Each structure stands twice: as structure tokens, then as C-alpha cells.
């Protein structure tokens, strides 16, 4: 009798110590989740409760006939008797929904628990812990190569033989994603808010659940593909820019497409070069002007020295101004020939016969008198004067004759015949 009493005493303790299958879920803020709870018995009360701060107390969130006020219009419970499970859907999750949940059957929440769920709600969603392969867009040839050469990558798509299987999808982005063209072999899926699923089955689970799991994962990959494709596209562009432009290309990512320090150095360098060129031109022009002025001054000095050396003495100028001109004028149209000594008078003959060795201190030119012969008719345009006019002092070398076109202005000469010009 005592044995049975002890057995009944320890029976609740053994039930409480039973380990429940646990599922951990990470959900983005504002997302939704579907929890699949096993249903060991039919036609009983089904519930989802939340573990409170005090141990052993689990507050009912939703049941067959009850919904907590905080979760109204956000939590629904749907039984699936043919699959021996029931679904609990939670939407519009916030950070206040973090915590530990449990689903079970029975009238009391502290008994009949069948599954434990740990829910984490945060703003940024990390990598899915169950995803083993990268789901970004890949070329078809690479996809076929991975399927043939690495079949172990797709092993995670099949349900495991353990008692608990968790299914999580990425959350819905805040903006509407652009449509993505899928191959014709894949059925198009209407976009819905991201759904997170968690369910637990026993090892003897019927194979009828496998197609549903595969279809769910396919729809999950199609739903998250636009977001990850966009991320992979930006990552690839960044790697290409870094590879092509080297480590110093970071300034272009910040919008500085021109190397500013080098550009600032080039501006004063260019301006300084222009100033040097202009200064060189000015100096060259000044040097040329100075050389031209020095050459001009040298020419003027040489001309003055030449004129001073060729100027005669004043006595010679006075004698030269008083000496008469000869009749053999090169500008005269009527030259005269000198007469012989026999035609001269007795007073002039000794002068002509004088020795040549006598010093001509004062040279004089004798003019022969006009012969007493009849005048010859000659055509003359000009008649030269017998005396040289006064010459300016500024031009001592001037020995030119001044011709007067009219013979009426001629001075009176010694008696003798004159040339007649018509």
C-alpha cells in the first residue's frame, strides 16, 4: 500500500521533468509567424501560452474559444485534425512579443505542453540559421554544376528524422520589391507578408508532410530572392570598383571623383608658369630697346666725328671763298678751251712760263680774256657764273655751282665776246 502511495506521489514530478522539444525563431519587427504544434489527442482544448516571469505560470494567449486582449486581431488558431496538428499564426510582431511560448492540449496550461517556442523580435534580421546554401541569383550553369557535383548542399531540404523541425523565412521589406522573372518551370507565387513557421513532429511522421515542406521552402526562396539579389548586385559592383581602381578609390565612394589635393597644387603651378613667361617677354623687350638705343647713339657719335675731321681751317675757307671759278665748268653747257701761250699778252706770258717748282702759297686761277673773234652761235640752256657764291659754314665741302636759267641776270665781265644763247 505504501508503495502505491509513493508511486502516485512521484508521478506528477516525473511528468514535470519531461523535456519538451524546443524551437528558436528570430523575427523582424512587424513580421508574422506561423507555429505548427503537434496534436496528440483529438477533440480536446488546444492552446498557446506565454511563460511569465514567475516559474510554473503560463498565461494563455489563444485557445479554441479565447483570445487574449493584447493579441486580438493578431493571433489566430486553426486546427488541422487530419494532420494531427494545429496552426497558430501571429502577425504584426513587436519587441514586446519577445519571450518563451508553449503550445499544448488540455484544460490547464501547466500540464499537457507539447512544444516550447523561443521568439526573438528585432529590427535587423540576421542570416537564417537553418539555411546552408547561399540563395542569391547564380548562373544556370553554376546551379547545374552544384547539383551534379555537390548533392550534399541540397540535403538540408529534406526533413530530418529528429523530433523537431523549424522553418523560418526572411521578413517582408518595407518597400515593395520589383517583380523578378522566374523560369517557366517554377510556378509564380503571389507575394504575401513574410511568414515564419515552426512545427514539431515525431519520428514516425507521415510522408504526406514532405511535399508541403518542400513547397514552403521553394516559396520562401522565391520570396527572399529579390532582397538578396539586390544585396549581391551592390556587393559585386563594390568589389569591381575596388579591384579596378585600387586602394585609393575610396575617395570616389564619398563623391570626390577628382583628387582635390593634387588639383589645388596644379592651379598655383600653372599660374606661376604663366607669370614667368610674361616676365621673360617683358625683360626681353626691354633688353632689345636698350640695345637699339645704344646702337643709335653710336651711329650719331660716328657721324659727328667724321664731320669734325673733314672740316677745313678758316683761312683756307676764306681763300677758297675768294678764288675765282674756272670757265671749265662741268655743269656748263658751253665749255671754253684754254688758249695757247702765243695768244696771251706780254704781261701774262711770264706767269705762264714760270717754273713749276715755285710754291703755290696762294693758288690763283687766271681767266683768259675773251678773244676778239666773232661770237659763235651756240645753243645753250644755262650759263655759269664766274664767281662762287658764299657757302654756308655748316657745309664746307660744297663746291657746287649755282646756275641761273636767265642770262639777263649775269654780271658784267671784262670786254670780250659772250656766248649768245637763243
Swiss-Prot record:
The keyword Transmembrane helix applies. Disruption phenotype: Variable phenotypes are observed in mutant mice generated using different exon-targeting strategies. Common features among these mutant mice are the increased B-1 B cell numbers, increased autoreactive IgM and IgG titers and increased susceptibility to acute viral infection. Residues 1-16 form the signal peptide. Residues 284-422 are cytoplasmic. It holds the Pfam family V-set. Residues 290-367, 391-422 are annotated as: Disordered. The chain crosses the membrane at residues 263-283. GO terms for molecular function: high-affinity IgM receptor activity; IgM binding; polymeric immunoglobulin binding. Residues 18-262 are extracellular. It is found in: Cell membrane; Early endosome membrane; Golgi apparatus, trans-Golgi network membrane; Lysosome membrane. Disulfide bonds join 37-103, 49-58. The record marks 382, 401 as: Receptor-mediated endocytosis. Residues 344-363 have a biased composition (Low complexity). Keywords: Cell membrane, Disulfide bond, Endosome, Golgi apparatus, Immunity, Immunoglobulin domain, Lysosome, Membrane, Phosphoprotein, Receptor, Signal, Transmembrane, Transmembrane helix. The keyword Repeat does not apply. Its main location: membrane. It is a single-pass membrane protein. Residues 290-308 have a biased composition (Basic residues). Phosphorylated on both Tyr and Ser residues. It comes from the Eukaryota. This is Immunoglobulin mu Fc receptor. It comes from Mus musculus.
